[in-house]
């Protein structure tokens, strides 16, 4: 009788755990450890992917420029094609890879998010460090063209996808932009050709760069997609934030470094050019290869990119200078946009 009472008290105390409960607790415990491991692996893939993308793009541009110089291609043409496209190579690789993997949220989110980051965060930080002078041609022609192209992307995506025809339209605008840059550069002073790399070294750089970009984009997309799954986030959110920041690292490092060295006047031109390449070349190429679905929520994101561009243009349209006050305004704009992303 006493033994039965003790057993009853033991069961009621909660110290007793039957086999089914024990198995369930073990499953939850190891499931949590598995998710933690998946998070670490996914973060590692994203970081490694971005590192390979940035370094691979550098190698590819250096090698391709060296090969072009060895074959007598003018520096003007090299600058307009290889070097200019090189700044958008990480975005291009990630977006095209994501399109093939069916991750449309990353494909479009990466481009739109990068364009918003380039203006609000990168130019915002650079101008807080030191006021940035802006060329008149950038204010009068290139900024309005950037805003027009951003609006064009939104309009093309309103039917729910960026089709091959849409891609052809973007590429036609891209060729017009290249022609404009060619005419502008011919009217200016042509840069002297730097000492070209040896041909063998240039070929090696191209191969290493291509491998780095391909592997880096694959790792970054897989890692970002897995993080979205684990945390229950949309690929749109991941593409607009984490992936966009990672692929914008070259522009961030270049612009902030230029501002610290007193060469900030090149920052805005590079950012505007990069934003144009992102939409016209990257989205155009991605959609020519495979039509890209366009989430209706990207309309708001695209309009935000347009608003940021308008604010930038309004800040510099009179004095042709982006001041510290303007930089703070751009940074605050991104904070509000990020809060919107977290809410919706």
Predicted regions and their residues:
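Hydrophobic alpha-helical segments, chiefly the membrane-spanning helices
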Residues: 9, 21-344
């Amino acid at each position: 009788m006493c033994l039965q009472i003790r057993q009853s008290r033991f069961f009621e105390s909660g110290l007793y755990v039957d086999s089914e409960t024990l198995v369930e607790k073990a499953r939850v415990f190891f499931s949590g450890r598995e998710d933690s491991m998946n998070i670490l692996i996914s973060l590692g893939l994203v970081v490694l992917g971005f590192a390979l993308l940035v370094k691979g793009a550098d190698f590819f541009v250096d090698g391709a420029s060296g090969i072009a110089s060895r074959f007598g291609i003018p520096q003007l043409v090299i600058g307009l094609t290889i070097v200019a496209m090189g700044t958008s190579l990480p975005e291009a690789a990630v977006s095209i890879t994501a399109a093939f993997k069916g991750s449309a949220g990353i494909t479009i989110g990466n481009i739109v998010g990068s364009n918003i980051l380039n203006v609000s965060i990168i130019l915002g930080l650079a101008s807080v460090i030191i006021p940035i002078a802006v060329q008149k041609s950038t204010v009068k022609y290139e900024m309005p063209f950037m805003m027009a192209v951003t609006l064009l992307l939104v309009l093309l995506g309103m039917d729910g996808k960026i089709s091959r025809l849409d891609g052809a339209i973007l590429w036609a605008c891209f060729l017009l932009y290249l022609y404009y840059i060619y005419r502008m550069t011919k009217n200016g002073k042509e840069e002297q050709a730097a000492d070209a790399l040896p041909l063998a070294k240039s070929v090696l750089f191209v191969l290493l760069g291509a491998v780095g970009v391909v592997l880096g984009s694959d790792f970054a997309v897989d890692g970002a997609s897995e993080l979205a799954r684990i945390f229950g986030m949309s690929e749109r959110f991941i593409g607009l934030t984490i992936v966009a920041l990672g692929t914008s690292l070259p522009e961030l490092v270049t612009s902030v470094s230029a501002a610290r060295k007193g060469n900030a006047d090149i920052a805005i031109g590079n950012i505007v050019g990069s934003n144009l390449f992102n939409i016209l070349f990257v989205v155009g190429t991605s959609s020519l290869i495979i039509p890209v679905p366009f989430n209706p929520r990207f309309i708001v994101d695209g309009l935000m990119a347009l608003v940021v561009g308008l604010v930038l243009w309004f800040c510099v349209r009179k004095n042709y200078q982006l001041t510290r006050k303007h930089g703070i305004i751009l940074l605050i704009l991104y904070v509000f946009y990020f809060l919107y992303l977290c809410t919706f």
